[in-house]
């Protein structure tokens, strides 16, 4: 994929992929093809162009399902990115199930996108936001987990891979321990899906947000809805 980055037509070392990644030529070509040949709404028309777009959209959903090994394509919800996906969970699950006195646990490694929505939700609901710290090695301090993971914790938010440190967190262990007390787990997989094979069924996470950019996924364009979520 790196050789297909259009921006590499000049000497450049780009190390800010944690913030945003460059688009390879196949993505740009597919987007251009869409706008030039079959620009239309998805699931909003019965004419030819709309049918083409709808079929492509649903094929993209099936591709994502297979890629992250979700149990059903119905588990895949397209959003504009991991940030929107996390906010979607906060404003749906969070508003419906988080109550006064409940606790939400995140880690010290989280991107602001997996902190601020929970801060705002806790302010609205009178809930408590707790933070699992990391140690001098840049690893989560699991020795504090038993203290922080109380029966009041209703949701745990954890990054699969830190966007700053690159630490690969033991998310499967965290998910198992959270589930034992009845908490739901949201995994921010934005920095993991490009480098680690993802199997959401094996992880047993409740919600997962990811940003996907891979050649195999370009067979069908993601129209209007840009990124994938909800195993994103």
PLM segments and residue spans:
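Pyridoxal 5′-phosphate
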Residues: 1-4, 8-224, 232
